[in-house]
Amino acid sequence: MAETQTLNFGPEWLRALAGGVGSSIVASPPLSPALPKYKLADYRYGREEMLALYVKDNMIPVDLHDKEFLPILQEEPLPPLALVPFTEEEQRNFSMSVNSAAVLRLTGRGGGTVAGAPRGRSSSRGRGRGRGDGFYQRSFDDVEGGFGRGGREMHRSQSWEERGDRRFEKPGRKDPDGAPAHFPLNHIRANYEDPAAVNARKFIHAECDNWRTTRDELNGEEDDNGWRLAGARRENERWCPPSPDGPRSAGWREHPDQRRRFGFGDEERSGYRRPRSGSGSAEEERDSLPEWCLEDAEEETGTFDSSGAFLSLKVRALEKAPKEPILEEAELDFRPLEENDEYAEKDDSETEQTKDTDTNTRHESDRNEENCKSEEPSPVAVPFSAVVTPPKATTPAPIQPVHLEKAEDKERPSERTTLPEIRHELSKAPLHTALSNSIVEAISIPHVANKLPDLPVPAPSVLPVKSVPPQSQQVKPIEMPVSVPPALLRSTGSVGPISRPSALPSDLDEDEGLKHFEQEAEKMVAYLQDGGVDDERLASKIGPKPSALPITNEAAFKWFYKDPQGEIQGPFNNQEMSEWFQAGYFTMTLQVKRGCDEMFQPLGEMIKLWGRVPFTPGPTLPPILGDADQERMKRQQEINALNMYQLQQMQYQYLLRQQYALQQKVLNSAPPPPPPPQQQLNLLLHQALKIRTPEPQQSLLPPVTRSMSVPDSGSVWEMQNPSTQASCSPNMQPAAPSTWEGSSVWDLPLDNMPQASSIEQLQLEKAKALKLEMERREAELRAKREEEERKRLEEALRARQEEERKRLEEEELARRKQEEALKRQREQEEAQRRKKEEEERLAQEEALRRLEERRREEEERRQREEFLRKQQEEERRKQEELEAQRRREEEKRLEEEAAAAAAALLRQQQEEQKKREQEAQRQQELQRQRQQQQEALRRLQQQQQQQQLAQMKLPSSSKWGQQSTTANSLSQSQNALSLAEIQKLEEERERQTREEQRRQQQELQRVQQQQPQTKLPGWGSVAKQPMATKSLLEIQREEAQQMKQRKDQQQQQQQQQQPPPQPQPQQHSTNTQQNRTQNRAAINTSVWGSVNNVSSNWMMDSSVWGDTQNSNIGFWDEAVKEAAPPQTTRKSHTPKNKGNANLSNSSSGKASKKVEEEEKLLKLFQGANKNQDGFMQWCEQTLHTLNTANNLDVPTFASFLKEVDSPYEVHDYVRAYLGDTPQAKDFAKQFLERRAKQNDNQQKPQQGQQQKQQESVWGIREVPQSVLLQQQQQQQLQQQQQQRFETVTSGKKKKKQKMVRADPSLLGFSVNASSERLNMGEIETVEDF
């Protein structure tokens, strides 16, 4: 039982995975380790499911685009092996029996491995087929089915077991109810051109291919015991596949009448012959099966269907309904074909009666054959004979089958591949039938006989009529050459045989025989209709005649084809047809046409006509119009010839039966009947000619069809007259009834004719024979003429087709040349376009490069210009520094020269002082006169000051202007003090200055200790340094001290200048110059001091605001300390005053303007000090209530608004910051009124305080009229402005006055120029020097 392991179910890898668990009911280990058992997979998929999962257009996954996968990545996916045609080696592998190959390989006997390893399938009997270990590369000769060698196609979707019953069957007719089959690619006809394909097959099989017998011998079992004997010798048909008429079966378990007939070795080799019997019961079938496949086994067994599901055999045995075929398998039913398996199915339409009758005959012939005869495949015997039993024979002679099929099989491929002339020759070849009293000896084809040297039956030629003595009991065979059309030879089992009645009564009814012959004629004509569709198809469906579609129809240029069942399929586009053609589904004989064509043509003819595969892209041909009349005429000729042949045969058979009946009557001593009336023959002829086929449909055959006419050589009538022999044996008994075993319509049994003894009978027969001979000759002449006419028409048609083909080839050549020219032109245009694009791209790159270079050059140029500009700026700055240094040196030199001049003047003054002391007395005398002059001068100065004040328009709150004017007026009216008093005052002033400096230093140190981290950055940080803010009272007190000091100096000067009397104009000019000098000194000692205040110790100078050089008093202090007499002082001052006169005159206007601006700034500064009086408190409270938007710094805005003089500007600022509301307008009006009152209240105490100060220093002095006048004018001016504002407020838009400059400390830098830099600040002229 170990050998049966080769029939395990499932693929090999599944059995190996299973490890023996549940994969087989046999517990014994397998014979070879090469067939291990595996565990079954949890999920199994059928072929259709796996193919459905394959999508050709799927994109490559993104993960596989990595660089590491590039060497092994293939752009185009490999198609599934089910869609790839087999190579020749794979076809040879598939044509072998897997059981035989596996057993022979395991036992080491013969059957070496084939050259090509199995591809994409398991070597053992596994259903599933994987791709195998390696990767598959198509060889260069693995092409699709073409004209020459076309490999036999098999359906890749089926493994050996799935194919099971249909492994070797011919692609026969399908079940009409099932899905229409696709294309059986039986390219085996083309394989006959390749002798290697034929010879290679016989070396594959071992000496004995009956593997069951081989195993029996190995196991030492007897030939006559066990199921193996039954399987090998007895009921071999049990193992045959079922009939293709039914659906696919599962194997042995089907009932015998559901099984397909299949001779496993009948047509393949003589060593393994299988009878064609379908008899036998279920019990016998069980006896002939191995025990491991019986249903009473221990475990449940079954098979796997195409979806991978397990099917129990018990369940399947209970189901009597046949399983429906899988749709795709039904549509794509490709099966392997042996060289001689064209006729594996012969008696598809036989009745059960015929099947049963030839069973015994087949069994006897099988027993006479040896099992393993030779390696070569022997010719296959098919019963083609008419068995005739002699009259007195007790047992029938042994049947010698006629070996015809091999020759016919070889004849057919040549018909398919050669020109129509060869077909005509084949159809003309006579078939000689030797008729004897026991058997039809042989049927052969003479011109094919040389190909079959091993035929056991000779091919006799036509023999002349021999006379045999009447005493001879041995009847010589009657040789009758019969010409059988190839279609009849090819379909011997297609037409049901005529079964004669078992007993032939002596009074045979002639009408019955005539009716019988008419039925046979009808069958023959019906076969001709069917055979015209396909020589191998007997019951094909003939579709309607195709008609051409108009060009405008969308399906006009789509493709239609006729499937093997004769049905028209379509329309399909070019892409679908091309894919099917490349997949190998189409044979060269497939009938195809476009929608616009009128007729179908074979694909091979279409390819020749088009010059290419018509489905591929290219120019299309005009619609092909069918030559329907010619086809119809040819077909009619064939039918006429066949009808004539039928008529002759029917007449001959009828005459034979008449003679036989006549002889029986003569033997029964009956009077001879009259000859058959001419009316009966005419009626028979009329009825035979009335059987006409309708106009034949257009068939799937090529346009040139085979001839069905009667051949030239060999005549039906060239036969021995039966009456000659009948007359020699008058003593013979009537013939026993015999069964007719022939497979042709005309192989009717001819019973032995009793010999007539009467001379009249012989004469009558001779006359009839002469008449028949004449009719026969006329029929032959007519047939010859028709044959010649047909040949001529065929020749003309062939010539026309050749011309058409040449024309199409020339057109195709011209079209190809035109296409090549167009292709070259397109390539040139493409090259020019690419060249132009390349030039454009280069030009763009060049332009970009130039643009980049230009941009880079521009950047470099800009950098160079920037560098040059910086260099020029640096050089200019250096030049300015050099110029400033030169000017400083020049100033220093001038100062030194001035010091030298001052020293010289001092010496001169000392000398002159002595002279003045001498003249002092004289001056006292003149003092009274000089006082008068001074009084006039004071009045003149008052007028000048009033004019200046009118120009300056000082506000009422400016204290310094009043004080300076007061000081000037006082200095002129004071009496000269003594020198000791002046020195005391000077010492007192110096002491106060030192105390003030010491106090300022202490404050500065304290501030620096509080802010030790404060840096001294540039000029922008000056405003951020802490200011030693003083109250208004302190500032006024210090200013009063300065004014007192100036008055002291002026008194000293007056005392020095009083003794020498001078003319009045000179004194006037001197005093004017002194006053201007003093004014300029006062300007220098203004509130803000000089620019040197930027330094951190700006409060360490001698004055209140820190003039660094103390230029206002340095010169006069020295003069005072010299204590020179008055005369020298006046003399020494005269040149100096002259030198400074122009300078004072030119700068007086500027000084007054600067004093005015500085006073305004000081007002703003005082407001920043937040002198919180009642007016300011009211102002801030009101602003807080009005500041609803919370966007105003109230203290700063109040102090700023307080210093704005113009009522217009006050209203503008209030409107801008507080909004144009009634509350804001009311606030502005109240603000102006309160400010005016406060200014009046502030001016009165200040005037009183000034009077007190003047009284404390100089005694009680009256306030100068100019000061009072100025104050009055200012008050009047403010009142006028207020009134003017009130009157104009209701008018139109106000004109803004000039805005007051802000405190420079708020800006963070000083607006005054440095005193060390020239050309900055005031404009100086040459006259200033």
Curated annotation (Swiss-Prot):
Residues covered by region (Disordered): 109-184, 236-419, 720-740, 781-1081, 1122-1155, 1236-1256, 1279-1302
SUPFAM superfamilies (UniProt xref): GYF domain
Gene null: resulting phenotype: Morpholino knockdown show mild, intermediate, and severe phenotypes. Embryos with severe phenotype display a disrupted body pattern, embryos with intermediate phenotype show defects in the head and eye structures, while embryos with mild phenotype only show a twist in the terminal part of the tail. Embryos do not show important cell loss in diencephalic dopaminergic (DA) neuron clusters.
Composition-biased stretches (Polar residues): 720-732, 954-966, 1068-1081
Domain of life assignment: Eukaryota
InterPro entries in UniProt: GRB10-interact_GYF, GYF, GYF-like_dom_sf
GO biological process: insulin-like growth factor receptor signaling pathway
Positions of the GYF domain: 556-604
Transmembrane segments: none
Bias-annotated ranges (Basic and acidic residues): 150-177, 251-271, 316-338, 352-376, 403-415, 781-896, 909-928, 983-1001, 1035-1049
Pfam families xref list: GYF
Function in brief: Key component of the 4EHP-GYF2 complex, a multiprotein complex that acts as a repressor of translation initiation. In association with EIF4E2, assists ribosome-associated quality control (RQC) by sequestering the mRNA cap, blocking ribosome initiation and decreasing the translational load on problematic messages.
PANTHER family: GRB10 INTERACTING GYF PROTEIN, GRB10-INTERACTING GYF PROTEIN 2
Protein name: GRB10-interacting GYF protein 2
Protein species of origin: Danio rerio (Zebrafish)
